[in-house]
Amino acid sequence: MDKLKMQTVNKADENFKKLAEMFPNAVTETIDENGKVVRAIDKDVLMQEISCKVVEGNEERYQFTWPDKKKSVLLANAPINKTLRPCREESVDFDNTENLYVEGDNLEVLKLLQETYLGKIKLIYIDPPYNTGNDFVYEDDFAQSTDEYLANSGQYDEDGNRLVKNLDSNGRFHTDWLNMIYPRLRIAKDLLSDDGIMFISIDDNEIDNLTRCCSEIYGESNLIATFVVASNSAKNNSKFVSITHEYLLCVAKNKEETPAGWAVAKTNSDSFVKVSQQLVKSGKTMDEIHSELLALVKYPKYYEFDHYTYVDKRGPFRASDLTAPGSKAKYDVIHPVTKKPCKTGTRGWAYSESEMQKLIDNDYILFGSTEDVMPQLKNYLFDNEKSLPKSVLFFDSQSSTKWMKAQKFGFDFPKAIDYIKFVISMYPSTEFEVLDFFSGSATTAHAVMQLNAEDGGHRKFIMVQLPEETDEKSEAYKAGYKNICEIGKERIRRAGSKINNANEKLKDVPLLKDDKDVQLFTSIAKNGIDAVERTKSAFERVDCSCSVDTGFRVLKCDSSNMKDVYYNPAEYEQSLFSRLEDNIKEDRTPEDLLFQVMLDLGILLNSKIQVRSEKVGMRSYSYFDVEDGYLIACFDKNIDEEVITAIAKQKPYYFVMRDSSMANDSVATNFEQIFATYSPDTVRKVL
């Protein structure tokens, strides 16, 4: 029966093992700085094995480096003795939700998630500090004491990670930002699945360095795109140019494995359709409407609709060529007003005469004012709503800013909900995990829930945020939000409540006759604007028949549940060791222990957890049942053979208990025999 590690993996050790497996003859022994014999890699032997050019000393080479880069790599690889403690009182629907909200330093949280979520995340979106000269960034300096942090900055967390303003007068301006972002990106790569993708928002200050970081970590060939994201809200802190754009860097874990089919809805299509329909209702002629739409599509917000400059009762459409190369279909098409044959080109029509007549009868042909204009086919926007995402995007952030201000959350430049929904929808699936480890006001969580409500998806979110204190002068602080995590959690609660209320209202609306037949939705959309609106609401009611997960489990990063003696028993005198009744900290609950066990065993933190109470003989006991017997954890004291036998008969995959919980020496002696009899395949672990 083995003891659990109860600490994160040492990536440097893992890398050593990989090299040793590939090149065992390169493994040797040497003396370290403490005089101990340790295993090492013989560089000369390794170079012989891989037979490649080695760049030595000051020899010129292309490289991306900065002061403390080596320290950043070591920081990413170093293990930590931390845990995530559940907080039921701040959670929503803790027992049933599959969403997570994690409070803590995101570097530490990423390390804690590293084994459990290794290769399991399909999409990561982050909006890190932009390093504008007035940002707060993490300074991962674990050597200084908390008192020293207080003296240096006046801003720190209980683990000794401080937040410092990275002013552009600082000589380490880019270095500090790189030291912050680099180790986090390295660990994030491990969390991505082979077909996973990562999106990162950034501006001009660090786009170059961020691109180089991602090229080094992911490989230059896995950079998919750098989107330019335009906004209608200018940042008034620029001296010469009003900045109205930023960037969205998209990188794949492995581009060869990344799924194709990135068909996304055109941005701002609802707004464009609404304006077009208003023009139809205004009574203007087709030519007048065409002129107004030509002017409208010159605005960045509507540039995707530059061909959809006509509109009728069905909606906006683009005029397409009715001829086809090599076609021999030659016949007269009669103008509906002049009753004369329309102009034809050198090529034949793309449709047979009977097919053309059906298109005319159903008003799918656009005729000119006279027969001198060649007729064209109406291609409607609702038939072409999805396409490959464009590299230039436009999103209105004002609505999100107004909503945030109304909630008194105190964020000056929140990301637009529609923008994050668009980013998430680029991944061609509706059931996957979304991770945001700079979650801020939790826009990503809001977007995931909203998108699920709209398309019936089953996406899940993991939000990670440091509980950074809010400014005492801010509206958020005055409204009672003492740190950013309080804002994020409250936003998810309110957004979830709004989504649930909307669903309930839609469910109360009786289905119309046509709503029950999905195949009729497209056909009734061709019968007028009212039918289009009716179709849209019908889709919404059908979508809302599925339940949206608007809950979340709150987990908080904290020191390990285990006392120091658990990790370094050799450093304690035997007399002291024997007096320690337990190696678990006194203030930790059984559920605290369960979540650290789940992390150690690689069990997803949103797994189904049931607390069961049983009675065997005269003895009552309780235990945690995770995922219907995949893990059974019993942290009761004085566990006897009857309890061990009852648990073994359930045949769990894992069984975990306290090392100190066995009632007597007889239980310890017979423990393995009991499991060998009833459940020999169960993996047994102790704390």
Where are these regions (language model features)?
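DnaQ-like (DEDDh/DEDDy) 3′-5′ exonuclease domain used for proofreading
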Residues: 1-125, 130-183, 527-538, 545-547, ...
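Segments forming glycine/polar-rich beta-alpha architectures that bind adenosine-containing cofactors
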Residues: 112, 116-117, 125, 268, ...
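Conserved S-adenosyl-L-methionine
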Residues: 140-148, 178, 205-210, 416-498
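Conserved Class I SAM-dependent methyltransferase catalytic core
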Residues: 164-224, 482-508, 534, 560
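Signature of N6-adenine DNA methyltransferases within the class I
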Residues: 181, 194-195, 204-271
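Flexible, glycine-/basic-rich loop-and-beta segments that form/coincide
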Residues: 235-306, 561-564
